[in-house]
Amino acid sequence: MAFPTASFLRYRVRQLAAWLLVLICLPRLAHGQSAASPPFPQDDVRRPRIGLVLSGGGARGYAHIGVLKMLERLHVPIDAIAGTSMGAVVGGLYASGLHADALEQKLSQVDLSDIAFDRKERAKLPQSLREDDFQYPIGLSAGYADGELKLPAGLVQGNRLLALLKAWTAQWPDNIDFARLPIPFRAVATDLATGDGVVLDHGSLALAMRASMAVPGLFAPIEVDGRTLVDGGLVSNLPVQLARDMGVDIVIAVNIGSDLQRPEALASPAAVTQQMITILVGQNVRAQKALLRRNDVLLEPRLTGLSFADFAKGPQGVRAGEEAVSEAQARLAALSLSAQAYAAYREAHRPRGALAGGTRIDAIEVTTNGRVPVARVRQLLSVREGDVYDAERLNRDLSALSTLGDFESVTQQLVEHDGVHTLRIDAREKSWGNQFFLFGLGMSTNFDGRGAFNVNLGHRYPWLTQGGLEWRNDIVLGSNRASIHTELRQPLWQSMGYYVAPYAEYARRRSDIYIDDLPPTKDTKAFNNLTIETARAGVDFGMPLGRKGEVRLGVNYVRRSATFNYLALTGGVPVAQPMLRAQQPAVRALLTLDQLDDPLFPRGGYYLLANVEGGFGSVDKRFNTAQAKGLWATSVGRHTFNVALEGAGQFGANSPTKANGGYSGDGANEGFFLGGFQHLSAYAPDQFNGSYLLYGRLTYLYDLHVTDLLGLRAPVFGASAEAGNVWQLRDNFGRGAYLKSGSLFVGGNSPIGPLYFGFAAAPQGVWNVYLQLGRVF
């Protein structure tokens, strides 16, 4: 019998040692797999590992959903996902366990445009914020701190997007390793401080997706693990190498980047900036494309006519993604599995390690970074220790917090450590200041030499004290009017919204006085003008009506005067003649209901403003007024109808006469004015003055369904029919003929506010061509 050779014995010894090592390590390996999923679940060790790379591109990212739908139909397994920007959002949601059809259905049920651009449902805002967007439609807010003015780091804070992503990934704790997801996932972001690429592979999945798509200048940067991050497209918009580093054998890369525009299409600084970003991103995309190998697959859906912000065209993007896969089906077929093998793959990639249903919150940690006390944040949270974690319920609480206007962002994270689930609420105040300035512009002209211009400036200083005291100032400087209003608002019971507001204000208004032709004609001219001054100081008690509006009740002391500036009767040389002076203590009730969906071009909702003021005490001339105006809007498709009504009058005083050159004031009341755009549009501003007023308007708006028209965003074509009149005597109120006017116009939002251009006509040959900047109701 031959004896084994020495080399054979060495082989047997090594083989035995290897088996012993396997037996020793096997329990540890089994324990490790139960603690965390391996990078690639072992459904079929013989097939190549496939990585999916999804690029950024905003709304064009809907194409990724179409790609995923087709890959599922072809039974192509995905073992790892690397994504950037919108690709990180779609990829992260898919990796978390949302299949393509479920993802498409979820996105179809939300308005991603409103969510991505942080458009809040206006009806749910506090009344103070609704007041501001009425007065300052530009929407620009500058902060002031440390002796300098600052602007927000982004036009959009991204709070609604983050909340949505958190709700859709709520089954995963916020300190998870992304390798534990059903499909291992990585997102790419850019460190704003260094310019380096950052791979996000652990922590909050929602936060990682939000950070990856923080387009500089548009979305505010976001802090993750102490680093300020922005969109990953700046460094790697198509992260092929990242997928390769995750251990895949084959890459399916989907590039949805925007195409370069022709030079003649670059008609604005914003367009040039976008072109520059597209060029820079395109350079890193080309570098990543160069890393693709022969067996890799590159998909580039045809997305002509679909821009970064065209979220409304999502279905078009989905179809483009499906078509791109269909065109590459021959190559992808080699990667597909049998039905049985694909079912095993899906089973292996079911969510494991997610939060169990009914997970209870063991502790709540709230942090703030400014003057708003932690107790205020806790007060507005409905969740308590011991409650079952409900991401959507908590998002509703955080949404209510963010709409207060005090915070830049309010985020939630549920982290698990040693079996203890801690809910962390981070409320960050606005980083661009502790005082804020608001801006607005107004202008009107009918191209005949008459016109007016004004600048609006607002100042807000919230949380002067821990009790929530706010200082509010509003200034109007214009050719025909000037005013200043200063007010302190002190909350009494913050949980109920009550407040007390001492205030002081001064207003000066100049209006032309017209010859009282009945009916008025095109030749009706102003023969003098009137300057009205009002000074008032008082204190109001404010009470909210839920989120529908508020009531203010108060007392004040008011002083009024009117001065005539005669022109025509003095050969054109103005002669000022004080005519009317009065002062009195008064009580006032002010009701505001505001449920319009938009303050400028409402498509739905209603608005009501009612003001009643009456004098008291021993005064020579007591003046009492009541005024109300309302607007109701409704829409069907692209068609919108608005109905506006207004009424005003004096009560409890002697009926005024018309002895003052056409001015209706009785020595105390300045009367009410009618005329001007959308206030009898064919006539001059404030052409009609009386002690009593009635007015109504029906307006039709047609959405032109284009993104931009002559610099106007969301332009509309409009037509209006108007009727109204003023009366001097109470007994004549509502009687006689009504003045009528009709108009046709084009309007839309411009960078400096709402803009209208149109034509108006009335009987007796009266007509106007007008250009109006600023709010009209």
Describe each PLM feature range.
Residues 99, 108, 190-193, 203-205, ...:
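Solvent-exposed coil/turn segments that connect beta secondary-structure elements
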Residues 407, 432, 464-466, 493-495, ...:
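Outer-membrane beta-barrel channels and translocator barrels
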Residues 2-20:
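Bacterial N-terminal signal peptides that target proteins for export
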Residues 403, 409, 422-424, 436-446, ...:
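C-terminal outer-membrane beta-barrel translocator/porin domains of Gram-negative envelope proteins
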Residues 2, 28-84, 92-399, 403-410, ...:
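Patatin-like phospholipase
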Residues 266, 510-516, 561-569, 653-666, ...:
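Outer-membrane beta-barrel and related beta-rich outer-membrane complex signature
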Residues 391-397, 409-588, 669-681, 686-690, ...:
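Gram-negative/organellar outer-membrane beta-barrel architecture
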